UniProtKB/Swiss-Prot annotation:
It comes from Arabidopsis thaliana. Residues 558-911 are annotated as: Homoserine dehydrogenase. This is Bifunctional aspartokinase/homoserine dehydrogenase 1, chloroplastic. Keywords: Amino-acid biosynthesis, ATP-binding, Chloroplast, Kinase, Lysine biosynthesis, Metal-binding, Methionine biosynthesis, Multifunctional enzyme, NAD, NADP, Nucleotide-binding, Oxidoreductase, Plastid, Repeat, Sodium, Threonine biosynthesis, Transferase, Transit peptide. The gene is AKHSDH1. It comes from the Eukaryota. One of its GO terms (biological process) is threonine biosynthetic process. Residues 1-82 form a transit peptide.
């Protein structure tokens, strides 16, 4: 068998191919050699010469625990325990020379007696090293220029950080390493293949270089500092699942040996890399540096492990998906483990295992924000001072790009081994099961797998259960694609009743359909599967419900006229109070009129919405507007607020409710329009968790609808509803006294802004008729607006006037009739009032001008007040009366605002 000389990779041969490679190398002053092998290396007569020629300056390529060192050190026993603090800095933290200086400053500032610092490669370097391997395997000559880029990156960083002997020494080692890498990559280039050992060796160099540079920078501060090649100490055993398990016994022995030769108060250790028991270089795979730090922390029995990142700590949810996510002050080991498993950017679950054994707390800190205290992960503390001390749920996490596999059939019940057969088939294709849910009836089993693996899983199951499917024992193997998992995590869930109810209630109110549910008996998490498109909205909904953020509503305002504009101003003025005291965030993300609309995902600046509407508004498009308000996945709940009197807009309500958009409106057209449309909307409202509020349709800001509902819901029976429902007509007849003519009072009201631009819209009685129709329907009567008797106060000859001006000009000609009715009423000690009546006993309604005694509540009104009297079974002798302003922009907008807040409370805001 041909033998090729290279540099040492292992201290025993690794049999991976048909060509053994003998690799001599020089480390310090000692020459050793060993055997490694290339897989499927093409035999060539010149292979030895080709590879040997690449070796300019042989250097160490593997673990060297058995080698002598150049510099003798004072022998000493390794002191373990609380005197040690362990820090881990990721690639972003050591991404350039300035950041390495910042890291050194943190290390120097730590007043712990002894410090071990674990570092990753500089940012992107590990990816660059993998890219070198890929290029060499592909026989792409550009690996040489890419390697030069790696050299230059580290050379430039070293020049910026070091000087004198430290710089010369590091650059010499760097150049030697680059030459050896060049030889290794040349061998990979020739073979067209890199074994795992060769790959691990190549990619581990980034950590070697960053550790040496950081150690040199710390020494510039005059401190006793050395660096550790973790391959000399850390021993791991590869597993069948492409992971590694630490060998603590062997690692302890090697650490003791290493420390007797390298005792120092500060040790800078390489993360990510280690050795096998056979001294073959390996890595701890992705996220391995955190794992390295945890293992080292356990080996040194440190008092704390601090993992430095570029975030302030562990968040209650992904802040990219939930903008109001908060940094948690504490997490238990189990909570961190669960959140990591379900995709939270905390730690890899295996990182927690080594430190749990010795109760070593982990602190997640931000290297770019040293003032932030971070998150401590430790054993659960009964009196923990965390965010929301008694919060049963600490946080939420999601996993996307999953598919749900449902195996269903009556033949599964009571048959031993069915579940085993299912998951054996899944294992055979190498698929990873994320979540399992089984019905207690044993009729079905469903589980979630990554979407990229579901095709293989489906084929394996159909093959395994072909006979059972043909025989009817299994009814189907169903694949549900485009799914996501949402998990709620909290150790206190187990001792807190009602957590599940709150969780599922929040999802229901956000109109989220759940595909599958799983919860272990430990109750550390509740897991649900939802549609991928609903995932962010579901996350926001549950996050809000557990008080970890505000209850947030995406608000779309339709009709920014007098009422809508006043509402926007009220929301602007009250926004801060709502957020601070009630945890409600009303985010107006859209405003549309008949010609222009304005939209902003983060929320429109209400201090200048009028200006923005003019400058940035685009052409109005109701369908586009609707999709925008509904499609904002960052806000789980959306509401359309219709401030118009447009029948076309009202016809959209059913579709909005069907799409999960709540509706708030003062527009009377939907509830007083065609009866079938009204019944359809109310039926949908009752069957879904989508809300429809319309208090302002009858009494502006007065609680008319809510009072009526309260009476009915408590078992009272409506006999009669009678009232003055129009603020305009109330004002007219309250001031139609003495010798004043009716036309004079109408002109005065129009001038004061109490009437519509065309007063005939008020005098026709249609507005009152709509309110009577609404109240009749709320009372259970099936009345139609068209069949309601309405007394029109517009004289017939004037109903066809071409303009409001013409009408006002001719109105005095008809004053005599109403003046006569007033005189007759006064003679009888009565007054005229324009009222609407719902007669629930006779099942009819009327709108007419009636006379009331002067001591009647209706006769004692002033201004533009409304008054409504409810005569019921309970309030038969003395009606229940609601009285107050029933018109005006401020009170109407206030009524709409009240409905919006009522919706927020329904959705989980604290009351």
């Amino acid at each position: 068998m041909p033998v090729v000389s290279l540099a040492k990779v292992v201290t025993s041969p690794a049999v991976a191919g048909d060509l053994a490679v003998r690799v001599p190398f020089i480390y310090g002053k000692r020459l050793v050699s060993n055997r490694v092998s290339f897989g499927k290396l093409r035999r060539r007569s010149c292979i030895g010469q080709c590879v040997r020629s690449e070796l300019q300056s042989p250097r160490v390529l593997g673990s060297v625990t058995d080698l002598a060192l150049d510099n003798s050190v004072e022998n000493g026993h390794l002191p373990k325990g609380d005197s040690w603090a362990v820090h881990k800095f990721g690639g972003t933290c050591v991404g350039n020379s300035e950041r390495i200086k910042d890291v050194a400053a943190v290390v120097v500032k730590d007043d712990s007696e002894r410090k071990l610092v674990v570092v990753s490669a500089m940012s992107k370097v590990t990816d660059m090293m993998y890219d070198l391997i890929h290029r060499a395997e592909s026989r792409d000559d550009s690996y040489l220029s890419a390697l030069s880029g790696v050299l230059e990156k580290h050379r430039a960083t070293a020049v910026d950080l070091l000087d004198g002997d430290e710089l010369s020494s590091f650059l010499a080692r760097l150049n030697d390493d680059i030459n050896n890498l060049k030889a290794m990559l040349r061998a990979i280039y020739i073979a067209g293949h890199a074994t795992e050992s060769f790959s691990d060796f190549v990619v581990g160099h980034g950590e070697l270089w960053s550790a040496q540079m950081l150690a040199a920078v710390v020494r510039k501060s005059g401190l006793d500092c050395t660096w550790m090649d973790a391959r000399d100490v850390l021993v791991v055993i590869p597993t069948s699942s492409n992971q590694v398990d630490p060998d603590f016994v062997e690692s302890e022995k090697r650490l003791e040996k290493w420390f007797t030769q390298n005792s120092a108060k500060i040790i800078i250790a390489t993360g990510f890399i280690a050795s096998t028991p056979q001294n073959i270089p390996t890595t701890l795979k992705r996220d391995g540096s955190d794992f390295s730090a945890a293992i080292m922390s356990a080996l040194f029995r440190s008092h704390q492990l601090t993992i430095w990142t570029d975030v302030d700590g562990v968040y209650s949810a992904d802040p990219r998906k939930v903008s109001e996510a908060v940094v948690l002050k504490t997490l238990s080991y189990q909570e961190a483990w669960e959140m990591s498993y379900f995709g939270a950017n905390v730690l890899h679950p295996r990182t927690i295992i080594p430190v749990m054994k010795y109760d070593i707390p982990i602190v997640i800190r931000n290297i770019f924000n040293l003032s932030a205290p971070g998150t401590m992960i430790c054993r659960q503390i009964d009196d923990e001072d965390g965010f929301k001390l008694d919060a049963p749920v600490k946080g939420f996490a999601t996993i996307d790009n999953l598919a749900l596999v449902n195996v269903e059939g009556t033949g599964m019940a009571g048959v031993p081994g069915t579940a085993s057969a299912i998951f054996s088939a899944v294992k055979e294709v190498g698929a990873n099961v994320i979540m399992i849910s089984q019905a207690s009836s044993e009729h079905s089993v469903c589980f979630a797998v990554p979407e990229k693996e579901v095709k293989a899983v489906s084929e394996a199951l159909n093959s395994r259960f072909r006979q059972a499917l043909a025989g009817g024992r299994l009814s189907q193997i169903e694949i549900i694609p485009n799914c996501s998992i949402l998990a709620a995590v909290g150790q206190k869930m187990a001792s807190t009743p009602g957590v599940s109810a709150t969780f599922f209630n929040a999802l229901a109110k956000a109109n989220i359909n759940i595909r599958a549910i799983a919860q272990g008996c430990s109750e550390f998490n509740i897991t649900v599967v939802v549609k991928r498109e609903d995932c962010i909205r579901a996350l926001r909904a549950v996050h809000s419900r557990f008080y970890l953020s505000r209850t947030t509503l995406a608000v779309g305002i339709i009709g920014p006229g007098l009422i809508g504009g006043t509402l926007l101003d009220q929301i602007r003025d009250q926004a801060a109070v709502l957020k601070e005291e009630f945890k409600i965030d009303l985010r107006v993300i859209g405003i549309t009129g008949s010609s222009k609309m304005l939209m902003s995902e983060s929320g429109i600046d209400l201090s200048r919405w009028r200006e923005l509407m003019k400058e940035e508004g685009e052409k109005a498009d109701m369908e586009k507007f609707t999709q925008y308000v509904k499609g904002n996945h960052f806000i789980p709940n959306s509401v359309m607020v219709d401030c118009t009197a447009d029948a076309d807009i009202a016809s959209c309500y059913y579709d909005w409710l069907l799409r999960g958009i709540h509706v708030v409106t003062p527009n009377k057209k939907a509830n007083s329009g065609p009866l079938d449309q009204y019944l359809k909307i109310r039926d949908l409202q009752r069957k879904s968790y989508t809300h429809y509020f319309y208090e302002a349709t009858v009494g502006a800001g007065l609680p008319i609808i809510s009072t009526l509902r309260g009476l009915l819901e408590t078992g009272d029976k409506i006999l009669r509803i009678e009232g003055i429902f129009s603020g305009t007509l109330s004002y007219l007849f309250n001031n139609f006294v003495g010798t004043r003519s009716f036309s004079e009072v109408v002109a005065e009201a129009k001038q004061a802004g109490f009437t519509e631009p065309d007063p005939r819209d008020d005098l026709s009685g249609t507005d009152v008729a709509r309110k009577v129709t609404i109240l009749a329907r709320e009372s259970g009567l099936k009345l139609d607006l068209e069949g309601l008797p309405v007394q029109n106060l517009v004289p017939k000859p004037l109903q066809a006037c071409a303009s409001a001006e013409e009408f006002m000009e001719k109105l005095p000609q008809f004053d005599e009739e109403l003046s006569k009715q007033r005189e007759e009423a006064e003679a009888a000690g009565e007054v005229l009032r324009y009222v609407g009546v719902v007669d629930a006993v006779e099942k009819k309604g009327t709108v007419e001008l009636k006379r009331y005694k002067k001591d009647h509540p209706f006769a004692q009104l002033s201004g533009a007040d409304n008054i409504i009297a409810f005569t019921t079974k309970r309030y038969k002798e003395q009606p229940l009366i609601v009285r107050g302003p029933g018109a005006g922009a401020q009170v109407t907008a206030g009524g709409i605002f009240s409905d919006i807040l009522r919706l927020a409370f329904y959705l989980g805001a604290p009351s």
